[in-house]
């Protein structure tokens, strides 16, 4: 996938993560979700039309169409987030879509690794598969406590899977980045997410007792 567009994907992941963390009101995230969602859809359509103009798939190669599929996967996510927020829609359908998107992302991971032989992008797609799975847990399950870890994961991945790779790609350095460093960064993010999930689950199962901070009650003396 052309990583230039992921400068803006990084921005959307950051904003949506902050929404899940409670730092940004949901309605204020609508414009950026709409704009980036529409831009990614337009880019995907352009790739498809260009590939068709080049002739049969063997001549054009499989990579452009896989890129278009990836753009549409993210585009539908952001557009659905925007529409749900505008209409006050309940988010379980988006959550189940994210489970499907996680499965597709896993397939694209294998394609990038085994067919297109691009291990750098394979690592990123593996990370996005985990991100979509986290969104499924946050939106389609009764585990409300999983929303904050999912938000933190989105914020971290906005940097490690989108912004930094996109900027490196613009500078022409992405392909030269050590694969071990790329893999290590994504592994570290997933470990942090797992730790947050365990912590939030413990808090949900064993909530801390409320601490009384007001004045002591006055009792009548005998």
Role assignments for model-derived ranges:
Residues 68-141:
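Membrane-proximal helix-loop-helix units in multi-pass membrane proteins
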Residues 119-222:
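C-terminal transmembrane helix-loop-helix hairpin of multi-pass membrane proteins
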Residues 49-54, 110-116, 166-172:
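Juxtamembrane "helix-exit" motif on the non-cytosolic side of transmembrane helices
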Residues 29-35, 92-101, 148-154:
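Cytoplasmic-side transmembrane-helix entry/capping segments in multi-pass membrane proteins
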Residues 14-25, 78-90, 135-145, 194-201:
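C-terminal ends of transmembrane helices
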Residues 1-63, 173-180, 193-222:
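N-terminal topogenic module of multi-pass integral membrane proteins
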Residues 1, 24-28, 59-66, 90-93, ...:
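Membrane-interfacial loop-to-transmembrane-helix junctions in polytopic alpha-helical membrane proteins
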Residues 37-43, 99-108, 152-165:
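Small-residue-rich segments of transmembrane alpha-helices in multi-pass membrane proteins
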């Amino acid at each position: 996938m052309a990583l230039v567009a992921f400068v803006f994907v990084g921005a959307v992941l950051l904003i949506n993560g902050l929404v899940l963390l409670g730092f940004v009101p949901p309605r204020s995230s609508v414009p950026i979700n709409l704009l980036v969602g529409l831009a990614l859809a337009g880019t995907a359509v352009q790739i498809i039309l260009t590939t068709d103009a080049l002739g049969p798939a063997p001549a054009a190669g499989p990579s452009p169409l896989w890129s278009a599929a990836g753009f549409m996967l993210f585009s539908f996510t952001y557009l659905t987030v925007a529409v749900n927020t505008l209409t006050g829609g309940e988010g379980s359908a988006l959550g189940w879509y994210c489970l499907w998107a996680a499965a597709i992302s896993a397939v694209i991971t294998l394609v990038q690794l085994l067919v297109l032989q691009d291990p750098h992008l394979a690592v990123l797609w593996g990370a996005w598969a985990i991100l979509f799975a986290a969104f499924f847990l946050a939106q389609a399950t009764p585990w409300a406590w999983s929303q904050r870890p999912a938000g933190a994961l989105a914020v971290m991945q906005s940097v490690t899977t989108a912004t930094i790779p996109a900027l490196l790609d613009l500078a022409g350095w992405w392909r030269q980045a050590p694969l071990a460093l790329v893999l290590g960064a994504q592994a570290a993010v997933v470990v942090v997410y797992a730790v947050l999930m365990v912590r939030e689950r413990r808090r949900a199962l064993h909530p801390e007792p409320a601490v009384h901070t007001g004045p002591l009650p006055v009792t009548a003396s005998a």
